[in-house]
Amino acid sequence: YYMIQETMTVGDFLLFTLLLSEVNPPFDAGNDGNLLLARVDKLLEFGALDPAAALLDQAGPEDPALFRRWFDVSLLIGREDAACMTMQSNPKITLSLPARIFCLARQGDWNAAALTLNSAEAIAALSDEELALLRHFLESELPNEKEALPSPITPLVFKLTEAVGEPLPTFGLPLAFSVTDI
């Protein structure tokens, strides 16, 4: 993230410095974690994945909102196995079927991943785009034509397209995705 600092305006640099500061939340901030989530979101906007990961690691991914961000950051920095193990040890932490299917497959349980995908399709729990991408990921068959991608592009969609041999260019995506180009 030192390259990021060189291209920042003075105001952004000061904000970035504040985001990295070790501080206690204000007394009237409550215990909902919104300040931490805002800090992490802004770090991700700056493309500073390592500091965001450090904040999330320190807080722990026990809260669903924290886990979602921790999972996304883990995918972008190549720690998807740790994220999937955390999800497996605490299945209530996420309701994201695509993430569950991805992790089941990553951990080698292809049958459970396929069963989960088929169940999600039967109850119409996923969009057509998500179904097509996950089916392509699980079945490793080449699609007849270019499938539309789910919108917006999430770190999971980004990782799935990479896994099927069709990586997305990072141009036009949020800055956090560009870490994969380095």
Indicate residue ranges for each PLM-predicted region.
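Alpha-helical solenoid repeat scaffolds
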Residues: 1-182
